[in-house]
């Protein structure tokens, strides 16, 4: 809150909490005293804001103005109204440009698994070799 608003609030509270006489002791009052114009003008000057032509603002209005608003519905309306589809190549290019040059930002390249190497020889070749080598 601004200092002017605090001062105004304190003035209002001070006026309501002014020392009052106990109810049993009433002072005899005479005719009401007229305040001179000068004091009225000074009091009116105090109530006015310091800037020319400004109207005192409500604290609730100030709060509502600064209060966080949820823009989800407005954003969703906007997004659903604009249904322009972008080409896949364009979107991939945008994603590529937004990626950094560090290794952690780059996609992992998939490595191809090597197939298990099979034997060149067949079972018959092994049996033939066994008979020639061992002679059985």
Swiss-Prot record:
GO biological process, one term: ribosomal small subunit biogenesis
Source organism of this protein record: Homo sapiens
UniProt tissue specificity: Widely expressed (at protein level).
Processing after translation: Citrullinated by PADI4.
Region (Disordered): 13-58
Residues bearing PTM Citrulline: 7
Domain of life assignment: Eukaryota
Pfam families listed in its UniProt record: AROS
Function: Part of the small subunit (SSU) processome, first precursor of the small eukaryotic ribosomal subunit. During the assembly of the SSU processome in the nucleolus, many ribosome biogenesis factors, an RNA chaperone and ribosomal proteins associate with the nascent pre-rRNA and work in concert to generate RNA folding, modifications, rearrangements and cleavage as well as targeted degradation of pre-ribosomal RNA by the RNA exosome. Acts as a chaperone that specifically mediates the integration of RPS19 in state post-A1. Direct regulator of SIRT1.
Residues annotated as transmembrane: none
Compartments in which it is found: Nucleus, Nucleolus
Main location: nucleus
GO MF entries: enzyme binding; RNA binding
Protein family membership: Belongs to the AROS family.
Protein name listed in UniProt: Active regulator of SIRT1
Keywords of this entry: Citrullination, Nucleus, Phosphoprotein
Residue numbers of Phosphoserine PTMs: 84
CC per GO annotation: cytosol; nucleolus; nucleoplasm; small-subunit processome
Quaternary structure and interacting proteins, as annotated: Part of the small subunit (SSU) processome, composed of more than 70 proteins and the RNA chaperone small nucleolar RNA (snoRNA) U3. Interacts with RPS19; the interaction is direct and mediates the integration of RPS19 in state post-A1. Interacts with SIRT1.
């Amino acid at each position: 809150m601004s200092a002017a608003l605090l001062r105004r609030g304190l003035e209002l509270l001070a006026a309501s909490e002014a020392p009052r006489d106990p109810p049993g002791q009433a002072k005899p009052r005479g005719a009401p005293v007229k305040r001179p114009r000068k004091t009225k003008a000074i009091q009116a000057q105090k109530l006015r804001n310091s800037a020319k032509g400004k109207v005192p603002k409500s604290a609730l209005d100030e709060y509502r103005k600064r209060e966080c608003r949820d823009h989800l519905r407005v954003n969703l309306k906007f997004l659903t109204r604009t249904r322009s589809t972008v080409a896949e190549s364009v979107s991939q290019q945008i994603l590529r440009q937004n990626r950094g040059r560090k290794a952690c930002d780059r996609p992992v390249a998939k490595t191809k698994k090597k197939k298990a190497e099979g034997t060149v020889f067949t079972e018959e070749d092994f049996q033939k070799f066994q008979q020639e080598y061992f002679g059985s």
